[in-house]
Every structure is written in structure tokens, then in C-alpha cells.
Amino acid sequence: MSVDRVMLLIDADNVSVDVIEQAVEWVGKHYGGPHVRRAYCTAESAVQHQQLFKRLSIRPMVNLAAGKNSTDIALAIDAIDLAIVERPAVMVIASSDSDFAPLVSRLREKGCRVVGIGQQGKTGDETQTVYDDYEVIA
């Protein structure tokens, strides 16, 4: 199925390389490929995953700010901005982080269908139920 305006936002500091690869593949299979592919990460992660990002056409969104949740905050700000400006049909967030629950609720209020993708064994049931759909990847 092909859907207009699909956005894939990856918490690259929170999921493995395998999950990133499988997330891109899964989104392509289910929605016809994401129009926006962004990975939010530290500078160290960006360098480490540079070849992966190039191969999968993922734009690294490097966060230079220090702090525990600074990458998560950058992803959340972009997600809201994209929801308002781009009006995507589907927003996919690849993360096993439960901190995104308020963001998911807000995106749904903005009319986005929000799908989560996370790592098996790292995402609690309570986190998964916030999303419209949630795909667990091994």
C-alpha cells in the first residue's frame, strides 16, 4: 500500500543498527517508503553509522547539545514541526523509549496516524498501546 506523506523519525541513540535497517524496510513494505527519513543522534553515533545512513538515504540530525534527553527533545520538536507544516498521513517513530508517549498523543491530536517501531524486549506494553500501531522488531 502506498500512502502519501510518510515520515520516519529514528531515535538512533536508542535502537540498534538492525532495527534501523528493518524499520526502513518495514515502512517501505507497508506504506510505500517514507518521504522523510531522519535519524536523531549524537555526533559520535552519526560518525559510527555514516555508511548505514548513506545506504538507506537517512538524513542524520546530529544533536550537539549535552544532556540526557537532548536527542529525544530534538526528535520531538521536529515531529511537531513536520506534523504542522507537512501534514503527513503517517508518522513512524523508531524508538523503544517510553518518553515519547506525550508526543504520540499530541501528533494524533494533529491528525497524524502514529506508528511505533521498537526493539523486542525493550518496549513495554503500556508504551506500545499509545501508538495507533506498534511493530516489534527482533
Question: Where are the predicted features?
Answer:
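Short, acidic/turn-prone active-site loops that include or flank metal/cofactor-
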Residues: 64-69, 118-123, 138
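Short, glycine/polar-rich helix-capping loops at beta-to-alpha or helix-loop-helix junctions
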Residues: 45-50, 119-127
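A glycine-rich beta-strand to alpha-helix segment
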Residues: 79, 83-125
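Structural recognition of alpha->loop->beta junctions
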Residues: 124-138
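Residues at the N-termini of beta-strands
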Residues: 36-38, 90, 133
